[in-house]
UniProtKB/Swiss-Prot annotation:
SUPFAM superfamilies, per the entry: Aldolase
GO molecular function, one term: zinc ion binding
Keyword terms: Lyase, Metal-binding, Phosphoprotein, Zinc
Gene (name only): iolJ
Residues binding dihydroxyacetone phosphate, per UniProt: G181, G209, G210, S211, N230, V231, N232, T233
EC number: 4.1.2.29
Catalytic site positions: D85 (proton donor)
Name the record gives this protein: 6-phospho-5-dehydro-2-deoxy-D-gluconate aldolase
Length: 288
């Protein structure tokens, strides 16, 4: 099955009160694990590459070729979107689109709102004629991800409305208390703000920093308009724990596949668990 935009995918998720998981890839095995989990769960999925890891992964063309090849080799039948996570510049988003990414996030959240809107509008103008979906962010998701460190800044309602109406985006990441990386204590999401932003904007919301959030908060966030939830830290932790256990228990092991296969298997199980938590399992039948 060919890669798809996440636009219709998220519309259906929002209407059906479930969320599509975004899972970041870190190499070939991660892509295989994410796609395997999606196929086994019959769940639509968003495979993402963080802009800060694109060069590490070999570049935009390499990532697109890898994922497209895996769709064929693994006989994937579920809807899959390839997404640029936290696109740093307009040009980087355009490069991703030209390489075959079917969705991009332009992260102008660290800029004044006027600049954020201007950047987002330019990306949307380039993306929409090419059937590529666009996500934008308002406010700042705290924590650390791929070397980026930041504090939490709640999304402003008026700014959210402006970005949606003026830039015509497909999905909005409104920062409402979630963080990238491990949480210190239980997360406290801004549900009251979430409800108002969802009602005023009408677009599918995106929850960044979805790792480690209790199930009851995830469910509430979905009911209040979140149709996309990003997960990376839990997969990283599961992979690291599995590989660390192998290396600790067998000091003489050196075969790469023997060392890393348990890590890949741990990612598969983590992704499947999150898909069930997000109520996405079985939703691939609702074709996009």
């Amino acid at each position: 099955m060919a890669l798809v935009s996440m636009k219709e995918m998220l519309k259906k998720a929002k209407a059906g009160h479930y969320a599509v998981g975004q899972f970041n890839l870190n190499n070939l095995q991660w892509a295989q694990a994410i796609l395997q989990a999606a196929e086994e769960e019959q769940a639509p999925v968003i495979v993402a590459a963080s802009d800060r890891l694109v060069d590490f992964l070999g570049g935009f063309q390499t990532i697109t070729s890898m994922v497209n090849s895996l769709l064929i080799e693994m006989k994937i039948t579920v809807p899959v979107a390839l997404h640029l996570d936290h696109g740093m510049t307009i040009d980087r988003c355009k490069q991703a689109i030209d390489a075959g990414f079917t969705s991009v996030m332009i992260d102008g959240s660290h800029s004044p709102i006027e600049d954020n809107i201007a950047m987002t509008k330019e990306v949307v103008a380039y993306a929409q004629p090419r059937n590529v979906s666009v996500e934008a962010e308002v406010g700042t998701v705290g924590g650390m991800e791929d070397g980026l460190i930041g504090g939490v800044k709640y999304a402003d309602l008026d700014e959210c409305v402006r970005v949606v109406e003026e830039a015509n985006i497909d999905a909005l990441a409104a920062a409402l208390g979630s963080v990238h990386g491990p949480y210190q204590g239980e997360p406290k999401l801004g549900f009251e703000e979430m409800k108002v932003i969802s009602e005023r904007t009408g677009v599918p919301l995106v929850l960044h920093g979805g790792s480690g959030i209790p199930d009851y908060q995830i469910r509430k966030a979905i009911l209040l308009g979140h149709a996309k939830i990003n997960v990376n830290t839990e997969c990283l932790q599961a992979w690291a724990h599995a590989v660390r256990t192998i290396l600790t228990n067998d000091q003489d092991i050196y075969d790469y596949r023997a060392i890393t296969t348990p890590g890949t298997e741990a990612i598969v199980e983590t992704v499947k668990t999150k898909m069930r938590e997000f109520q996405t399992s079985g939703k691939a039948k609702e074709r996009v």
